[in-house]
C-alpha cells in the first residue's frame, strides 16, 4: 500500500463509478506529472522549480478561461469546467511539490502537518467535489484521513526517504526521545527509536480515526472505497507496531492475509 502524494488517487479502483474515472485520471495525471518533476530524474533544483512553475502557468490560463497548451491540461480544463472543481487544491499540490525540492527537514510537527495539508489533503478535497459531497464536515474529516495517510507513508518510508537525504520525522520529536539523524543513517533500532515511533504511530492513528466517520456518511462505492483506504492505513500502522518500529529491516506492505483482515474490518465498521 502506497499512500504518498498522487498515489492517494484511487485511479484503478473498480469501486469508482465509470463516469468519474476519466476525471480522476486527469487529476492523477496532473499530480503524477508534477510530483515526478519534483522528485524523479537528475534535474537540478532550478530546473525542477521551473517545471512546476510551468504547471502553475497552465493552471493560471485555466483560471483566466484561456486554453492551455498541452493536451493534458486541456483535458484537465474540461474536467474542472464539467465538475466545477476549485483550482486551489491543484495550486496547493504544486506548492507542496516545490517545498519537496528545497526542504529536507521539518523542525516541528505543525510544519509537517502544514505540508500534509498541501501535499495530501487536496486529493480528498477534489474527490469530494467530484462526488458533489464537499460539505464542511466532510472536508474536515477527509483532511484528517489524507494527512494520516501521508504520515503513515512517512513512517513506513523512513529509510527510503533518507536515501534522498530527507527526514520527515519532526526534529523536535527526535530530540524529545533522544534520537539523532545517525539513528537513521546507521539504521539504529534501539529503545529511543522504538519510543519515538510508538509516539508517532499513536498520534497518526488518532488522526485517522478522527476522520473515519466520513466513510460511514458517504454512500455506495465511495464509502466502500474510503473504508478500504482507512482500514488499509490502520493495518500498516499495526504492522509497524508489530516490528516495534523497525522500518529499516521490515518496511511494511499489505499481504493477501492483510486484505482478508481489512475486508473483515470493513464489514464491521
Where in the sequence are the language-model features?
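Catalytic cores of Mg2+-dependent Asp-rich isoprenoid enzymes
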Residues: 1-150, 155, 159-269
Amino acid at each position: 500500500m502506497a499512500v504518498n502524494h498522487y498515489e492517494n488517487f484511487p485511479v484503478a479502483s473498480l469501486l469508482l463509478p465509470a463516469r468519474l474515472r476519466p476525471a480522476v485520471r486527469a487529476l492523477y495525471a496532473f499530480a503524477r506529472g508534477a510530483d515526478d518533476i519534483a522528485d524523479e530524474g537528475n534535474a537540478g533544483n532550478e530546473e525542477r522549480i521551473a517545471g512546476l512553475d510551468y504547471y502553475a502557468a497552465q493552471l493560471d490560463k485555466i483560471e483566466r478561461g484561456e486554453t492551455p497548451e498541452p493536451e493534458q491540461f486541456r483535458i484537465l480544463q474540461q474536467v474542472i469546467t464539467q465538475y466545477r472543481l476549485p483550482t486551489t487544491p491543484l495550486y496547493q499540490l504544486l506548492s507542496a511539490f516545490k517545498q519537496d525540492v528545497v526542504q529536507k527537514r521539518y523542525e516541528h510537527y505543525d510544519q509537517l502537518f502544514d505540508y500534509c495539508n498541501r501535499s495530501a489533503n487536496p486529493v480528498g478535497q477534489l474527490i469530494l467535489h467530484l462526488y458533489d459531497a464537499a460539505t464542511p464536515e466532510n472536508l474536515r474529516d477527509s483532511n484528517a484521513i489524507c494527512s494520516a495517510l501521508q504520515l503513515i507513508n512517512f513512517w513506513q518510508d523512513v529509510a527510503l526517504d533518507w536515501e534522498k537525504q530527507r527526514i520527515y520525522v519532526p526534529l523536535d520529536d527526535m530530540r524529545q526521545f533522544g534520537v539523532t539523524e545517525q539513528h537513521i543513517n546507521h539504521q539504529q533500532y534501539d529503545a529511543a527509536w522504538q519510543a519515538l515511533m510508538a509516539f508517532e504511530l499513536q498520534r497518526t492513528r488518532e488522526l485517522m480515526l478522527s476522520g473515519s466517520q466520513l466513510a460511514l456518511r458517504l454512500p455506495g462505492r465511495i464509502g466502500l472505497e474510503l473504508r478500504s483506504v482507512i482500514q488499509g492505513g490502520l493495518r500498516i500502522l499495526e504492522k509497524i507496531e508489530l516490528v516495534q518500529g523497525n522500518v529499516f529491516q521490515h518496511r511494511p506492505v499489505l499481504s493477501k492475509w492483510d486484505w482478508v483482515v481489512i475486508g473483515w474490518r470493513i464489514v464491521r465498521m
